[in-house]
UniProtKB/Swiss-Prot annotation:
Any GO molecular function: citrate (Si)-synthase activity
Protein species of origin: Tetrahymena thermophila
Keyword field: Cytoplasm, Cytoskeleton, Mitochondrion, Transferase, Transit peptide, Tricarboxylic acid cycle
GO process terms (BP): carbohydrate metabolic process; tricarboxylic acid cycle
Localization annotation: Mitochondrion matrix; Cytoplasm; Cytoplasm, Cytoskeleton
EC number: 2.3.3.16
Protein name (record): Citrate synthase, mitochondrial
Major subcellular location class: mitochondrion
Superkingdom of the organism of origin: Eukaryota
Family: Belongs to the citrate synthase family.
Known pathway: Carbohydrate metabolism; tricarboxylic acid cycle; isocitrate from oxaloacetate: step 1/2
Role noted for this protein: Structural protein involved in oral morphogenesis and in pronuclear behavior during conjugation. Respiratory enzyme.
Length: 462
C-alpha cells in the first residue's frame, strides 16, 4: 500500500506543479497554483476553442438540459460507474487517504475523513498533509465566531419558519460583512484580484456556517438554548457538538457526511445557482444564499427525508422484521399506485452510489444492531432486483439519499426537516471552492440564449 507521502508526490508530479508540502497557509498555496491553472485554461481555449463539444436535442433543451455539457467545473466529475471523482480521487480513496480526526488511531471507529481535508483537495488538487489540515482547522476556528447581532437575528426569527429559510436569511444577514462587496463598491479592486476577497468571504462563510446552522437547530428544536463552540474540535465535530450531540459516533458520522456531500459536478441546482449568481459578481453570501434556496427545493435537497418517511411508513405497516417477499409486495403496491420508491436511481450513475456504500460500511460497524438500519440494508438488496422487473425502470440502484437520512435518524437526529441544513453545510465547501476558482479563472457572467415555442416551429416544421 502506498503511503500518503508517496501519493502526494505522485499527484504533484502528475500535475507538473511545484507544490510546497510544508506550506500550511492555504491562500499562499492557491496563489502559487493560480498562474499554472490560468495558463492551462488559456491553452484549452486556444487549442480547443472551436471544437464541437456535442450535439443536443430539442427534448434536452425543454427537459432541463440534462446531459448537456454547458459548464466548466474543475473540482469534481461524476462517472456513471465510479461515482463522484474529486480531483481524480474516488470516495473509497478519499476515505483511505484523507486525514482523520485522530491521526494516531488505526481502528475502524476513527476512519471518517475530515472535511478540512477535502476542501484543501478541492482548492489545490492535492491531498493535504495532517499539518495542512490542522492549520485549516485552526483558521476556520479563528474565523468562525458569529457576532451577537447575527445570533439575535436568528433567535428572533419565528420558529415556524423552515430551517432552510432561516439559513438563507442568516447568510443574507452576514452579507453586510462581505469584503468583496466593500472593495468593489469603493472601486479598490481589479478583475485579476477578484479571487482574493472572494477567498476571504468564502472562508468566513465556511467557518461560520456550522455555528449558524447549529443556532438554527437549537432555536427551532431545543428551546433556543445555545451551546458554545469547542475550540479543541474540528469543523464537523464542533458542528455536532454545537447541535448537542457529544457521542463519538455522531461526530464521526457528521465528518463523513459533510465530506461525501460536499460537491457533485457543477450542474446540480445548488452548485449551478451559486455559480450563476456569482458570475454576476454577487459576493459569496448572496450567491450561496441563492444556492441554499435551490437546495431547499423538494427535487434537490429533500430526497433523503423522503426515503426516511417512506421507510417509517413501511415500518408502521409491516414492522422491521419482514421477508424479502413482504418488501417486493410493498414495492408492487407503491409502483401500481403511480408512486416511486425514493432513494433508487440517479441522473448520472448507472451503478450503486459509492456514497451509499460508504454509509453502509459506517453503519455496519457503528450501528450493526439497529433494526431500522438492518431493514434498510435488506431493502437495498431486494428493491433493485424488483425494480428491474419493470420495463420503464433502467436504473434501480441505491443512491446516497437512500441511506443518509435514515443514518441521521438512527443516530438521534430525528428532526428530518432539518436534514437539508446539514446538506447545505456540506455543500458550502464545493460551492465556495467553485466560486473562488471561477474568479481566479476570470470566468464571465453566465448568459445562455433561450427560444420561444414559435422558434421551434419555425426552425423544424417541414
Amino acid at each position: 500500500m502506498r503511503s500518503i507521502n508517496q501519493l502526494l508526490k505522485q499527484a504533484s508530479l502528475s500535475q507538473k506543479s511545484q507544490y510546497n508540502f510544508s506550506q500550511t497557509n492555504l491562500k499562499k498555496v492557491i496563489a502559487e497554483i493560480i498562474p499554472q491553472k490560468q495558463a492551462e485554461l488559456k491553452e484549452v481555449k486556444e487549442k480547443y476553442g472551436d471544437k464541437v463539444v456535442g450535439q443536443y436535442t430539442v427534448k434536452q433543451v425543454i427537459g432541463g438540459m440534462r446531459g448537456m455539457k454547458g459548464l466548466m467545473s474543475d473540482l469534481s466529475r461524476c462517472d456513471p460507474y465510479q461515482g463522484i471523482i474529486f480531483r481524480g480521487y474516488t470516495i473509497p480513496q478519499l476515505k483511505e487517504f484523507l486525514p482523520k480526526a485522530d491521526p494516531k488511531a488505526a481502528d475502524q471507529a476513527n476512519q471518517e475523513p475530515l472535511p478540512e481535508g477535502i476542501f484543501w483537495l478541492l482548492m489545490t488538487g492535492q491531498l493535504p498533509t495532517h499539518a495542512q489540515v490542522d492549520a485549516l482547522k485552526h483558521e476556520w476556528q479563528n474565523r468562525g465566531t458569529v457576532n451577537q447581532d447575527c445570533v439575535n437575528f436568528i433567535l428572533n426569527l419565528p420558529k415556524d419558519l423552515h430551517s432552510m429559510t432561516m439559513l438563507s436569511m442568516a447568510l443574507l444577514y452576514l452579507q453586510k460583512d462581505s469584503k468583496f462587496a466593500k472593495l468593489y463598491d469603493e472601486g479598490k479592486i481589479s478583475k485579476k484580484d477578484y479571487w482574493e476577497p472572494f477567498y476571504e468571504d468564502s472562508m468566513d462563510l465556511i467557518a461560520k456556517i456550522p455555528r449558524v446552522a447549529a443556532i438554527i437547530y437549537r432555536h427551532k428544536y431545543r428551546d433556543s438554548k445555545l451551546i458554545d463552540s469547542d475550540s479543541k474540535l474540528d469543523w464537523a465535530g464542533n458542528y455536532a457538538h454545537m447541535m448537542g450531540f457529544e457521542q463519538h459516533v455522531v461526530k464521526e458520522c457528521i465528518r463523513g457526511y459533510l465530506s461525501i456531500h460536499c460537491d457533485h459536478e457543477g450542474g446540480n441546482v445548488s452548485a449551478h445557482t451559486t455559480h450563476l449568481v456569482g458570475s454576476a459578481l454577487s459576493d459569496p453570501y448572496l450567491s450561496y444564499s441563492a444556492g441554499v434556496n435551490g437546495l431547499a427545493g423538494p427535487l434537490h435537497g429533500l430526497a433523503n427525508q423522503e426515503v426516511l418517511k417512506w421507510l417509517l411508513q413501511f415500518i408502521e405497516e409491516k414492522g422491521t422484521k419482514v421477508s424479502d417477499k413482504d418488501i417486493e409486495d410493498y414495492v408492487d403496491h407503491v409502483i401500481s399506485s403511480g408512486r416511486v420508491v425514493p432513494g433508487y436511481g440517479h441522473a448520472v450513475l448507472r451503478d450503486t452510489d459509492p456514497r451509499f456504500h460508504h454509509q453502509v460500511d459506517f453503519s455496519k460497524f457503528h450501528l450493526k444492531d439497529d433494526q431500522m438500519i438492518k431493514l434498510l440494508h435488506q431493502c437495498a438488496d431486494v428493491i433493485p432486483k424488483k425494480l428491474l422487473t419493470y420495463k420503464k425502470i433502467a436504473n434501480p440502484y441505491p443512491n446516497v439519499d437512500c441511506h443518509s437520512g435514515v443514518l441521521l435518524y438512527s443516530l438521534g437526529l430525528t428532526e428530518y426537516q432539518y436534514y437539508t441544513v446539514v446538506f447545505a453545510v456540506s455543500r458550502a465547501l464545493g460551492c465556495m471552492a467553485n466560486l473562488i476558482w471561477s474568479r481566479a479563472f476570470g470566468l464571465p457572467i453566465e448568459r445562455p440564449g433561450s427560444a420561444d415555442l414559435k422558434w421551434f416551429h419555425d426552425k423544424y416544421r417541414e
